[in-house]
Every structure is written in structure tokens, then in C-alpha cells.
């Protein structure tokens, strides 16, 4: 009999511990973490940890052995090893006091790029767009952090540039769909190339950075995400015919830095401008033109001049307008109406409006949303920094956004609103009444456009007292009928027919006693009773089927099913409680209105 070797198959072969992986790759633990983040490799959980760890029960981190084998052929791994030798040589040179050799080493240090990793992980562009949610969240987080010993100002500045380029593109293409102001920040959702992208921008408050955060891991993620976003933005800008990276208006950036400072130019305009600008240094190919070719070009130029002189000789010739003929036989039904550039209703929501934003309103969020919906913005904070205010025409202002309770002076012809009006209009996809958002008025609740975790919809209207009483009576009658009906769930067709006949006879007697013709009310009352009877039968059959399925479940599945039922019941109870509170509030409001009328 052949002896079976232990720990050579199954979990022991498929999984490898982290310490074994580090020894196999011959790099430090920090470099191993960076490499795993770049390549998208994360720890795995084997079914049997004891077998995977070759009999040991010590807590360890496992990876797939094939993933580690895949990392061994990574070009970035060689760059990490080169950097390790560079650091060793640099410390040796500095220790000896050889400053010149240290400078040479610093100038010739090896660098790596993540371009090939981006192409490997995201073979198609929709895959990259689908995965930029986390990238945007990380970059907007770093863009709002202060510079510290662990985070350099260059990193924060680069993150701010990428974030502003993203916002400028979304505003230019009018891709915003939903927005929600929460405690954490402002959530945005945009439709980019058919993919829903959602990200959060934190509020610009002074941040207290905790001391227990590992910024090395976060900086590694930031490095990868910034490279990914550069790829995505380049593709988005070029597909839209825009120049990437966009130019920055220095004067506008000094006044009020934001997406208004970015100039989005089309590639056609820049190509025309480059063609018009004469080149100072002629090309080498242009210098080596043959004399024969030059003579042919001079002859062609002379011919063109003669033709132009002949064409320009008759000066007083009247312009003759040619008749235009229409083809009436052409089938106009074949011509399809082309859709507009902005198909979403939110894209043209504020197209005819000019907003004057007060200095107390956060300009970054409001400006981005208004520009994304086609509106124009005039900021009071920007006007304060410009002397003379000659660039702004305030006569075209239609709406003024105010976030203060009382206004001393009001301009006729303007609609005064609070900032929440902009958010709610975008979520609804239509212009809401401005009377609900006047300055100093208590605002309606700002609800999440993505719904509640419980599934409760507070926008639904409260049922009236008559409807609620009718529904309660119906439920009571159903409960009574269920209590009376003590028959088992498996009812035969013969029993159903007998029950229907008994119901019909009883209904006929009741109608004769009340003086109503049975033939008139037969189709109304009898069918309702039969339908309710059949409905109860279906519910009983469903309950019986659920019981049979639970019997066939394993103990683990049964426990999981009970937990799910318990959590769902808790959600339903919470929803019912909220509905009751809403009904009570509606009743109080009605009574108060009645008292005020009296």
C-alpha cells in the first residue's frame, strides 16, 4: 500500500501564509502590502485553517498560492528590489560623507509606473468607470485634509487638481443626477457613460487627524487611485473632444479657486490655433526640399494668383440667387428625430436661470450643482474680491440663494430661496415651489433620494381616517373568518364546491329577506365571497409549503432563515411605528387647522 504524503494537496497546497509569501518574494512586509494593493490581491479565508496551516492552529493570514506565484513575475517587484539596493548605497555614501556620490545616486534612482497594472485590472473602460467610487472618495478626502508631517502639501495639491478636473467634466457634460446632504458630507450621483457613479465630498471643517491611522496604507491606495483617475479622465475628456489636462485661469483661481477656474477647450479649437501660429524653428525635412519641387510650387502659386486676379476683375456683377427646389416625393417619415445632447431632465433644469449666491452660502457645492443643471452663477464672495464689480451684470439675476433668516433689502423681480431648494429640485427632477423655501421659513425634510435602509417611504400620503377604519374592519373580519375556519390546508375540490354552494344559498336568503333581487346582486356579492375564500386557500397553501421547505432545511439553514425572518419583522414593526406616528401628527395638524378656522 502506497503511503500518502501529508500537506501536499487540498488547502495546504492552495493556500500560503503571509510570512511564507514574503520569504518567497524576498521583499519587506511593507513592500508586500504595497504590491498587494496595486495588484488587487487580498487575504483569503480557507475552509479548514488547520489543514491550510499544516496542522498549526496559530492565527495567520492566508493568500492563494497562485496569486503569490502571479506576483513573482511583476515588473514593479524588480523596482522595489532596486530601490532597496539604492537605499543601502545612499545610506553608505552619506555615512562616509560622500555628498557628490549621494547626489548622483539620487539623480539616477529608479522609478516605477502603474500604467500596466491599470490596464491589467481594468481591461475595458466601463470596468474602470464602475470602480472609481472608492477612488473619488479617497481623493476628495485627501483634498480636504491639512498638510502635516505625514501628508505633504504636494500630495494634497495633486488630489485637489484631480478632484477639480472631475467636477469640471461632470459640470460641463451635465451628468449629475442625485444629491444628498448628510452628516458625513454631500453625496453626489452622476451617470457617466451609462454607469452610476456615487461619491461623497466632506465638509470643509477643521479636521482633527487621529494618531492611530496608518497613512502608509492610505498613501499607497492614493497613489493607485490617482493613476486610475488620470486614465479615466483622459479617456472622458478625449471622448468629449476636450483637451486634457484642462488649462487653469490664474486670475480666476486667485479670486475664488474652484471649477470656474478651469478652461475646458475643445480639441478642434486648439488644433486651429496651433495651425495659425507660425513655427520659429523650421523642420529639417522642410530645409531639405529639392530645387525641382520648389520650382513646381512657385509655378503653382503664380497660376493661383493669375486666376484670382481674373476672378476679382468684374466688380459690379450682381449676385444671382439660385432657386431652391424641394423634393416632394421624399418620404419625410424616414427621418428620425434626433435626441438632444442632454436627455436627462436635470441637465436642463436651471438652463434659463441666473443665480446670485450670498457669501454665507457654501459656494463650491452650489456652484457645481447649478452649472451641472445648465444655470449660471454670480458669487457675492467673488464680487467682494474684484474692484469695481464691472464684470457682473446683476440685472439678469432670476434667483438669489440666501442662508440667513432676515434680509434688509430685496430686489424686485428676484426669487429668494434657501440652498435646499437646489438639492430638492435635482432629486425630484423638476422645479419645486419656491414658497416652501423662502428665507426664514421652516424647510421641508431633506430626504435621501436612495431611500431608507428600512424601506420606509415617508413621502407617501397618510391614509384618511375612513380608509384606515375600513381597512381595520376588513382585517378584523378576516381574522374572525380565519378563526372560524379550522379546516386543514389540504382542501379538496369537492369541499370547495360545497362551501361555495352553501355561501350562495345563504346569500340568496339574505337578499330575499332584504327585498333585493338575487339576480342583480349575484355577480357583486357572491363573487367577492368566493374570491376571498380562494385567497385564504392560496395563503394556507403557501404557509404549508413554507413549513415543508423548513423541514427539508439543514439546521444551519433553518437558523439563518429564522434570523432573516426576525430582522424583517423588526423592520416591518419599525415601519408600522413610523406610520402610526405620522398618522398622529396628521390628526394633530387637522385639529389645529379646525381650531384656527373657528
Swiss-Prot record:
Its main location: nucleus. The keyword rRNA processing applies. The keyword Cytoplasm does not apply. Residues 345-439 form the BRCT domain. It holds the Pfam family BRCT_2. Residues 557-598 form a coiled coil. One of its GO terms (molecular function) is large ribosomal subunit rRNA binding. One of its GO terms (cellular component) is preribosome, large subunit precursor. It is found in: Nucleus, Nucleolus; Nucleus, Nucleoplasm. Keywords: Coiled coil, Nucleus, Ribosome biogenesis, rRNA processing. Residues 463-485 have a biased composition (Acidic residues). InterPro entries: BRCT_dom, BRCT_dom_sf, PES. Residues 296-317, 452-501, 515-544, 564-598 are annotated as: Disordered. It comes from the Eukaryota. Component of the NOP7 complex, composed of ERB1, NOP7 and YTM1. The complex is held together by ERB1, which interacts with NOP7 via its N-terminal domain and with YTM1 via a high-affinity interaction between the seven-bladed beta-propeller domains of the 2 proteins. The NOP7 complex associates with the 66S pre-ribosome. Belongs to the pescadillo family. Component of the NOP7 complex, which is required for maturation of the 25S and 5.8S ribosomal RNAs and formation of the 60S ribosome. This is Pescadillo homolog. The gene is NOP7.
